[in-house]
């Protein structure tokens, strides 16, 4: 990339900065949830909605981001994304109630949904094709650093300042990023097709109301009748989308995608798999603080080995899949993650705290292997004309399943805790023990889906090579 013009390098820095903001925000909040609950006068059992409101909004808005960038221009949409994200951060810091915080997090989610996909699109437009891989490696590196710094930085700010600062630090950074975007980034546009607004609204309504219904009376305080109504609305919306997309060449996501068996299995496995693994980044710091009495900063530091294990495993995951095949790797890592989850709970409750960093490092390795294998399996056999649509659907499903996972984790805590989780409660560790046992079972269930994946090692070799050349 040394031969790129200075203006292009600055534009890549802006995109990298956006990736960092978005990735940092996905992890920095987790460590602060118990302190937020105390400050807002809420039960810690309700605080999972702070994460769900953000991730669910990202899932809902993702399908529209690429079309908006092509229609309005990448600079205008990227600038809007940074502004919305920064305003959402300000409103989060100013929130005096949980409901205000949830609305502000949803605003943040709108910005976050546009930031990363539009950033990728920007790189495609400003960098020559032969340098695309190097450019994407450069801009995504800060996105990998964000999860590494987020938990510890969040714990540090909570312990020595207040939880408000995990949002306030975004404001000066966001202002600088917005100004740099206006001054330095070109506003590329493309000829667009007619956006499938009907399909978008049906999917958005279906995803949102079903997630809210899942949270149920434990989180949102809804009556059984209201929950039943939400379920009915959500199911009807999704059925209407299926009818709408059938034989519709302009549908948001074509049903032709599901004619590819590996895509169907991979998407189903990714959805179910990320529900289980999506619980872990939320539950781990909460358990360390409320269940074991760790300080916010200590709990944040404990998350670093998990991120390091995940980053380190990415270098050899292709060789692992080539050697053993998708089916064996996915079944083994799914069951392995369930066992590591049980190991974490056991060592924590036994008081073997010095072992926890090693267990979390192992958890990161197993999870990373499974994620990479799921992603590649899902997309590897799609025809070229469906690859972009399949990738967008996978990205949406990833966010949706993580929001559902966090929702279920909060539901389990509420179910076993009966609203009595606190540091002084003698039943706290028992509540967490039952929750972690349930999580381990949920994490293991996708193994039944992955067991149906064809196990063709030679095919995996060819696909892995193609994957590496495309990155």
Curated annotation (Swiss-Prot):
Compartment(s): Cell inner membrane
Keywords: Cell inner membrane, Cell membrane, Membrane, Transmembrane, Transmembrane helix, Transport
Molecular function as annotated in GO: transmembrane transporter activity
Sequence intervals crossing the membrane: 12-32, 49-69, 77-97, 102-124, 138-158, 165-185, 197-217, 225-245, 263-283, 286-306, 342-362, 396-416, 431-451
Lipid bilayer topology: Multi-pass membrane protein
Signal peptide per UniProt: none
Any one GO CC term of the record: plasma membrane
Primary localization class, coarse: membrane
Matching CDD domains: MFS_LmrB_MDR_like
InterPro entries: EmrB-like, MFS, MFS_dom, MFS_trans_sf, Multi-R_MdtD
Record flagged with keyword Ribonucleoprotein: no
Domain of life: Bacteria
Coiled coil spans: none
Periplasmic side: 1-11, 70-76, 125-137, 186-196, 246-262, 307-341, 417-430
Topological domains annotated Cytoplasmic: 33-48, 98-101, 159-164, 218-224, 284-285, 363-395, 452-471
Family in the record: Belongs to the major facilitator superfamily. TCR/Tet family.
Protein name (Swiss-Prot/TrEMBL): Putative multidrug resistance protein MdtD
Organism: Shigella boydii serotype 4 (strain Sb227)
Lineage: Bacteria, Pseudomonadati, Pseudomonadota, Gammaproteobacteria, Enterobacterales
Gene responsible for this protein: mdtD
């Amino acid at each position: 990339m040394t031969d790129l013009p200075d203006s292009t390098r600055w534009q890549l820095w802006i995109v990298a900065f956006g990736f960092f903001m978005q990735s940092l925000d996905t992890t920095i909040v987790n460590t602060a949830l118990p302190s937020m609950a105390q400050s807002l006068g809420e039960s810690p059992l309700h605080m999972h909605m702070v994460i769900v409101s953000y991730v669910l909004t990202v899932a809902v808005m993702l399908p529209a981001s690429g079309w908006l960038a092509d229609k309005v221009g990448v600079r205008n949409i990227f600038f809007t994304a940074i502004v919305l994200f920064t305003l959402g951060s300000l409103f989060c810091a100013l929130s005096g109630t949980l409901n205000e915080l949830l609305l502000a997090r949803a605003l943040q989610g709108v910005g976050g949904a546009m930031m990363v996909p539009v950033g990728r699109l920007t790189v495609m437009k400003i960098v020559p094709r032969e340098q695309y891989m190097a450019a994407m490696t450069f801009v995504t590196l800060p996105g990998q650093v964000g999860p590494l710094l987020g938990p510890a930085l969040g714990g540090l700010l909570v312990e020595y300042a207040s939880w408000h600062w995990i949002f306030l630090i975004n404001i000066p950074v966001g202002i600088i990023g917005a100004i740099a975007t206006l001054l330095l980034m070109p506003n590329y546009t493309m000829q667009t097709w007619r956006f499938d607004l009907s399909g978008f609204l049906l999917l958005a309504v279906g995803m949102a109301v079903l997630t809210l219904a899942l949270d149920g009376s434990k989180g949102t305080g809804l009556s059984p009748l209201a929950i039943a109504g939400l379920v009915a609305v959500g199911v009807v919306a999704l059925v209407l989308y299926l009818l709408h997309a059938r034989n519709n060449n302009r549908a948001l996501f074509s049903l032709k995608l599901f004619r590819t068996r590996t895509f169907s299995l991979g998407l189903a496995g990714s959805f179910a798999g990320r529900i289980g693994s999506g619980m872990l980044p939320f539950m781990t710091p909460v358990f360390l603080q409320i269940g074991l009495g760790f300080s916010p900063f200590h709990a944040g530091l404990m998350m670093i080995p998990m991120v390091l294990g995940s980053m380190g495993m990415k270098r050899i995951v292709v060789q692992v899949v080539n050697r053993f095949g998708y089916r064996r790797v996915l079944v083994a890592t799914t069951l392995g993650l369930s066992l590591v989850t049980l190991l974490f709970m056991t060592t924590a409750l036994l008081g073997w705290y010095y072992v926890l960093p090693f267990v979390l490092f192992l958890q990161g390795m197993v999870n990373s292997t499974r994620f990479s294998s799921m992603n590649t399996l899902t997309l590897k056999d799609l025809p070229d004309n469906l690859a972009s649509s399949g990738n967008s659907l996978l990205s949406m499903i990833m966010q949706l399943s993580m929001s559902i996972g966090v929702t279920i984790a909060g539901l389990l805590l509420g179910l076993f805790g009966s609203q009595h989780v606190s540091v002084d409660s003698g039943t706290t560790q028992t509540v967490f023990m039952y929750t972690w046992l349930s999580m381990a079972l949920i994490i293991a269930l996708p193994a039944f889906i992955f067991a149906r994946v064809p196990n063709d090692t030679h095919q995996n070799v060819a696909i892995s090579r193609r994957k590496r050349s495309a990155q």
